[in-house]
Structures are given as C-alpha cells and as structure tokens.
Amino acid sequence: MTDTKTGDDKTLSVNTKKTLTIKRPGVEQGTVRQNFSHGRTKAVVVETKKRKFSRSDERVEPVAPMRPKAPAPSPAPAPAPQPRETPRPQPQQSRSGVVLNELSADEIEARRRALQDAKLRETEERKRAEEEARRRAEEDERRQREREESARRQAEEEARLKAEAEARKRAEEEAKRRTPVVETPAVVAEAVEEEEERGGRGGLAKRGAVKPEAPVRPVKPRGEEERRRGKLTLNSALSDEESTRSRSLSSMRRRQEKFKRAMQQEQREKVSREVVIPETITIQELAQRMAERAVDVVKYFMKQGQIMKPGDVIDADTAELVAVEFGHTAKRVAESDVEEGLFNIEDRPEDLKPRPPVVTIMGHVDHGKTSLLDAIRKANVVAGEAGGITQHIGAYQVEQDGNTITFIDTPGHAAFTAMRARGAQATDIAILVVAADDSVMPQTVESINHAKAAGVPIIVAINKIDKPDANPQKVRTELLQHEVFVESMGGDVLDVEVSAIKGTNLDKLLEAILLQAEILELKANPDRTAEGVVVEAKLDRGRGSVATVLVQAGTLKPGDVIVAGSEWGRVRALVNERGEAVKVAPPSTPVEVLGLQGPPQAGDRFAVVDTEARAREISEYRQRKAREKAVARQAGQRGSLEQMMSQLQSSGMKEFPLIIKGDVQGSIEAIVNALEKLGTEEVRARIVHSGAGAITESDISLAETSDAAIIGFNVRANKQARDAAEQAGIEIRYYNIIYDLVDDIKAAMSGLLSPERRETFLGNAEILEVFNITKVGKVAGCRVTEGKVERGAGVRLIRDNVVIHEGKLKTLKRFKDEVSEVPAGQECGMAFENYEDIRVGDVIEAFRVEHVTRTL
C-alpha cells in the first residue's frame, strides 16, 4: 500500500460562476491518495487544526450574513465579517499548501497518534472522575446507612427500655391489686393522678376522699413480719427492691460500652520518649522503657510475620526499629560503653611535665643484652637466670647524672616473640644489641621489625668488642640490608661500641639515650589518675597475684582501685625492682602491684577507676567477652563433637594432651606458642589448661580426666598434689629452661608418629619352570637376573609389566637345600606364602622392608 499526495488540493476561492465557499478558519486541509493492491485507490482528507478554542466562533460568524432573512438585526454586523473573512482564506490557502508539502507521512501518522493518545487520556480521566464520584457516592450511602442503623438501634433500645418500664409498672400494679391493705390507696392515688392530669371537676371531691384513707403505714410491719417468718411475697420483694434499688445489668452494660467508645474515640496525646537500647533486650523490657503494652509490641511483630513472646530477646537493630515505629527516639548503648573514659584522657599542655625515658633492650639470644644491663646497673642478673638466658621481662631504673632512665630487658629466645613485641610497644627508645663477633641473626631482624612497627627510635649497641674476632664494621654493613643506617654509614641511627664485660663506653651509651630522650621531649601529667601497661604477671605464694606494671601517665598510689585486663583490685602495696615498698609511682616507673583478684595477661593495659563497682563492671564485661571469644574459637576450630571425632579418625591425627603451669604469664605464653609450632598433620600438642601458679590438686584431677601430662615451669607441686598424682599415676615434669622443655615434648610427640616404611630393592628373578610338589604346592624354578634374592624377603609377582601379587617369600632352595640368599646368574626354587598362581615367564622382584623411627 502506498500513499501519494495529490497536488490538486481544493482551496478556498471566490469565483463568479461558483457559490462562495468558506472553509473552517484555523484548519488546513490536504488530500492524500492511498494506492492499494489490484489497482484500488482511496482519497483521504487530512486536516491540520491550529487553534482549538476559536474553531466554533470562526465557523459560526461567516454563516450569519449569508442568510437572506432577518435584514433588520444584521445590517451592522454583516459588512464587518465579510471584509475580515474574504481576504483570510487566500493566505490560509497558501500556508496550507506549504505545510502539506513539507509534512511527511510519518509526521502525519505521529500527529494522528498524538490526537488518539489525547483522546484516550481524556477518556481515562473521565473514567477516573466517574469512578471517584461513584466511590464517594457509595461512601456517602454507606455512612447514611450506618447513621440510619445507629438511629434504628437507638430507637429499639428506647422501645425496649420503655417496654421494660411498662412491664415493671404492670407488675407493681398487679402486686398492689393483690394486697388488700395497699389496694385502696393505690387505686385512689391512681385516680387522683388521672384527675390531676385531666383537671376535672371531681378533683376536689376525690382529694377529699383520700384523707380518711391516709394511714397506709401498717404495710411495712406486715412485710417485716412476713420477712421474719421467712416468707417472701411479690409485694414485699418489690417494695424492698425499691427501697435499696441498684442499677440494672442492661444499664451497667450500656455504661461500659459508652465508656469504651469514649476511650476509643478519645485521642490520647502521644508522648515521645528517649528509649535507651542495649545490645540485647527482651520485648517486655523494651515495652516498659517505651511505656507501651507488651501486647502491642507482640502485635507489631505478628504484623511483620514473626511470632514472638514478651520474654523473647531481640537485638539492638530490631529494638530500634520497634521504638521508631512507636514514635520514640532510640538511643543505642553498647556494653563496651562501660570502658568509655578509661584510657587516652586528654591532658592540658600546661599540666605536662618531663618524664624519664623508657628504654627496651632487644636483640638475639646470647648477644649480651642482660650482661649489658647488669653492667649498667652494676648488678648480676645473669647469674640468677636459669641456663644463663633471660626468660622474663625485667624492668629496672638507673640514675645517670641526676637523670633517671627506665630499662626493660626482653628475652632473645625465639619463643619469646610476644614478649619482645610488648616491650617495643611500651617503650620510648629501643636499644638493639648485636654481638661484634657474630652477625645479624633472626631475632635481631625481628627486634628491628618490632621497633619499626612501634615507631620508636633505635640505638645500636655493638657488644663484645673486647673479643679478638670482633668486627663492628661487618655488623654495620649487615644492618644496611634491613634499612638500619647508622651515623657512620651516612644515616641517622646512633651506634655505640660497648663491652659489657669490661664496661667499655657504657657512659657513651647512656649519653646517647639521654640525647635521644631530649630530642623526643618526653612529657606526662603526674597529677591525674594513673594508667599504663602490664609488663609481667605471676601468682606468688604468700603475696597472691603480683603484676609488674609500667606507669605511663598519672601517679599510682596504694589504695587506688585499678582494672588490668579482665582483673581488678585495690592496690595493697607497691614494690620497686629492689624489693622496697614505695608510696607513689610517678610516670615511667616500673613497680610490682599487689592486690589484684587474679594475674592479668602480660601486655594488658591498666587504669585507675573511681569505685569498686565500676571496676567490677568492667572486669565482668571483659571476662564475658573473653569467654565468648574462646567459645567461638573452639566452635570454629572443632565444630561439633561428632565432626571432631570423625576428622580425627579420618585424618589419623594423634594428640598429646598437656597441662602447663608456670611462674609468670609471659613464660606460659611463650611455651604454648612454641609447642603449637611443633604440630604436624599427624600429631599435635593439645593444651588442656595453662596458668600461672603452683601445681594444685585441681590440676591433678583435670589431668586424670583428660589423660594429660603436667609440665611445671619454675613452679612445684604441693604435697597434696604430689600424693594425688602418685595415686592417680599422673606424670609431673619440672623445667626451668625453655630449651629443655621444648626438646622433651618434641621427643615425646615424635614417639606418637607411626614409623616410616622404607623399601630396599634386592633383585629380580625370571621363572623358567613351574613344579608341582606334594605337600608344598607350586614351586617356581627361577634364574636370578639382577641383584640377589634373600630368604624371607618381600616379593612382587610381575606379569606383563603388571604387579599381580605382593607378599613374602616362603622358601628359597638351591639343589634341594635351603639357602639364605641366591646371587645373580644362579638358579633357585622359590615358593610364595598363600599364593600359587605362578606361570612361566613371570618376573619375581625381591625387596627388603625397613621401619624407621620418625622425628618431628
């Protein structure tokens, strides 16, 4: 189908031969001819409307003068429209021709669709308006019906009340009629009332007739006598009801319904409250805090699709949503808020005063850290350490030229990584001790990393320069590989060559420390509550829990209530490193604190609080969090008991249960970490329990239950515990050097490993003939082609390069004699244990099996 636009459009024209025709103003017309198949055509008139609202006016005005009748009213308007209308069609015709020549079929179709859409929108709007009107009419009708129904019910209620009143009145009249004494006054009274209402002539006469009948009072004594006799008449009952009349049930019911309607219709003013919401809360408690009914909160949950009870616990997010839904303001409060304001209290700059520097001595084991500190302190600590190695963190103070320096000595053994990390965190300056006759070792590198992680400056102390093979320059060069640039190599790190044995250059080392401290401008506020870090903790017999702490801010005094980790207590005494009791501990002072409820973990921060109640609250919160972490860790590691047992059975892993008791928390931590590193895929150490303090009977009971061995590090078992262990057959091992402890546990765990099976190839033999011998079975006549064959060796039968049997050699004969072995090139006879499927051409491979004990 094609559309062609014809050029012979009929336009508005004025011709003498034709009648004057006028098109509608504001409408441009054009003709479009459509060509269909089979030669069919169709002409379509296309109109373009320009002004929508002036169409009717322009169409009606020019028609008026064309009417021949009514000449009188139209002489004035007739000439006016003609001069306006006659020239208008000419330019309009020219415009319509131009527009139709420019409009394409797509544009025409688009305009047609736009008109259709407009009509559809109008139709839809009209439908919506009708629907809204119908809905409003239905709503009005429903309200009218409700009003009519309410009026009808009210009328019925009034009619019912009226009927009840009439029935009651008739009953009273009937009762009075049956009673002779009361009958005449009742009739007279009724007649009087009727007469008064009518206002009749006999009113006076009737009123006069009432006077002689006035004494009606004998009725009451009669009723009382009848009541005393136990007889109850209708009259007496009715008269008694009138004397003590109460509201009827219907009246009470109507009153309650009216009260309920009033309560429902009454708009109560909503009081918005600030609801404090903890991390978990029950629905009942939340409703109480919102001053709402718990039933309403439960209904809200039911609307959300959740069936809840008032005693159910919900989380803080859900509680906040409920509070907001009920129009209240939620204030979230976490359990950790109990720790707010405990640490990091801002001090005013004018309150800060200079404090001594805290120096940590770090380095590899046996590089002379403790010896250097002994030389500085002029003491002998190394002699008191088991094995000559430091296994605790020691904190000391040294006076130099009127200035105080606090030293912290850390272990250098690989097992004490956590101790070194804690020492670096609590320090201001780190002294890296490196032996001049040695090189940079693994723990040296680890100490460098700890110091860099803590962001503290490093001073390199090159020790043992008094030895003949000392090479300090080699140490400086190796430190460059780990980004430690000393001053002599163009860096900014101070380095001092010292000798702890001879005391060489110790004064230079102290001067370097004071210089570095002066650069750092170390200050603290001593006039505030104390806070710091726990360096070490232990359980001492006779003194209880003892914690070595380093005061970092404020002043610690006896009597202060402190919280250290998950433990709290009131400070009973402060003891310095020389065992002397002190009254105060200013900033940068290491002291031993007595009075805690239990030994805290090394590395925990401590702070002084106002009251014991707050200290107890913080301690309980931290203990609860620690328990939750432990449970989550165990659940994540082991899962359920069935899963754990199935994993152990499938993997074949063996466990070595241990109970570890030590003198201080730091040593226990180091031992546990060292033993956990010994574990493999086949065997691992399981720490049933670890703690600081002596070995007690409870430890023996736990070991008996879990079938564990007890390890004591620098502690002993009391007599009761030893007796219980001997009776239960529990082994207790004592150690004072961590090397020996780790080596013994490693050897014991190695014994749990299954031995390694090793095969040694002996030789090959080819079957030449198969003999069937009575009482023996099939015997293979073979020639040894490679190696040798031994009696009792393991054999494999190979056929077509495929192993079809593996077993042991039963007999090995040569010329009817049993031999121990047959070398290559010789012939022999062989028989297998419990196997006789041998053929000529098979190859027998002989091998020896050895079981080798494995070690970790």
Swiss-Prot record:
Positions that bind GTP: 363-370, 409-413, 463-466
Stretches with biased composition (Basic and acidic residues): 108-177
Pfam families: EF-G_D2 (PF22042), GTP_EFTU (PF00009), GTP_EFTU_D2 (PF03144), IF-2 (PF11987), IF2_assoc (PF08364), IF2_N (PF04760)
Domain tr-type G as annotated: residue spans: 354-521
Coiled-coil region list: none
Gene Ontology CC terms: cytosol
Keywords for this protein: Cytoplasm, GTP-binding, Initiation factor, Nucleotide-binding, Protein biosynthesis
Annotated region described as G2, given as residue ranges: 388-392
Region of interest: Disordered: 24-266
GO molecular function: GTP binding; GTPase activity; guanosine tetraphosphate binding; translation initiation factor activity
Region (G1): 363-370
Bias (Pro residues): 68-90
Biased composition (Low complexity): 181-190
Subcellular location: Cytoplasm
Region (G5) residue spans: 499-501
Region (G4): 463-466
Region (G3): 409-412
Function: One of the essential components for the initiation of protein synthesis. Protects formylmethionyl-tRNA from spontaneous hydrolysis and promotes its binding to the 30S ribosomal subunits. Also involved in the hydrolysis of GTP during the formation of the 70S ribosomal complex.
Entry similarity comment: Belongs to the TRAFAC class translation factor GTPase superfamily. Classic translation factor GTPase family. IF-2 subfamily.
NCBIfam families: IF-2, small_GTP
Listed name of the protein: Translation initiation factor IF-2
Organism: Chelativorans sp. (strain BNC1)
Lineage: Bacteria, Pseudomonadati, Pseudomonadota, Alphaproteobacteria, Hyphomicrobiales
